[in-house]
Each structure stands twice: as structure tokens, then as C-alpha cells.
Design a protein with these regions (language model features):
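Mobile "lid/hinge" segments at catalytic clefts and subdomain interfaces of large enzymes
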Residues: 1-27, 41, 105
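Glycine-/charge-enriched secondary-structure boundary and capping motifs
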Residues: 22-25, 32-111
Length: 111
């Protein structure tokens, strides 16, 4: 939902280390955010989304974990390569505006 870097400023992660940080996540383009929101609404309308979760307090790792709590028989097959972030701490703990969408196996949601 945002093309901003995976910043850690203001995050729960930095707070747990006793700091605040100086680089904070932001929505750099309101137009991009609106188009991303519209695309998600289209996927929901097409019945391709089974569940979704916002990335907020705790970052991506927290959103992913919270999505598994409802069913202890479920698992995840994840690839973060398309996100373009090599720093795994930034990737997992940044609280940048984002969504995690759950789809059925084999469903293609984007081109």
C-alpha cells in the first residue's frame, strides 16, 4: 500500500530496544495508496481473498502470526523476494502501511 522504505522508526521493535528511531514509514503517494486500495477491493469483490490483515503494531511478522491463530492446522508458504528488502529485521518489523492477503492455493491475484 506504500512504496516507502521498510523504516523502523516509531515501531514496536525499536521501542523494545529502548529507542524511537528517526526514519518512520509513510505513504509517499496518495494516488498509489488509493489504487492499491481499489485493487484489493476488486480482489475481494472477485472472491479471491479468503482473509486479510493490516500490517501495524509489530510489523509483518505479527500480522502473519495473528493470521495463523484461528487454525492450528494451517501453515504458510511465503516468499518475500518481490518486496525488494534484503534486511530481514526491517522486512519483518517495519510498520509501514501494508496488508497481508490470504488466497486459496493456486489463485493468481496479480500479473
Amino acid at each position: 500500500m506504500s512504496r516507502s522504505p521498510f523504516a523502523l522508526g516509531g515501531s514496536s521493535f525499536f521501542q523494545s530496544l529502548g529507542g524511537v528511531g528517526s526514519e518512520v514509514p509513510a505513504v509517499e503517494s496518495a494516488d498509489y495508496f488509493a489504487r492499491a486500495f481499489g485493487a484489493v477491493q476488486g480482489l475481494v469483490g472477485d472472491g479471491k481473498v479468503l482473509a486479510g490483515h493490516d500490517v501495524s503494531a509489530g510489523g509483518l511478522v505479527t500480522a502473519l502470526l495473528e493470521m495463523t491463530f484461528a487454525d492450528n492446522r494451517s501453515g504458510m508458504d511465503l516468499s518475500f523476494a518481490a518486496l525488494g528488502e534484503r534486511d530481514v529485521v526491517r522486512l519483518l518489523f517495519s510498520e509501514k502501511p501494508a496488508l497481508v492477503l490470504q488466497v486459496e492455493d493456486g489463485v493468481r491475484t496479480c500479473e
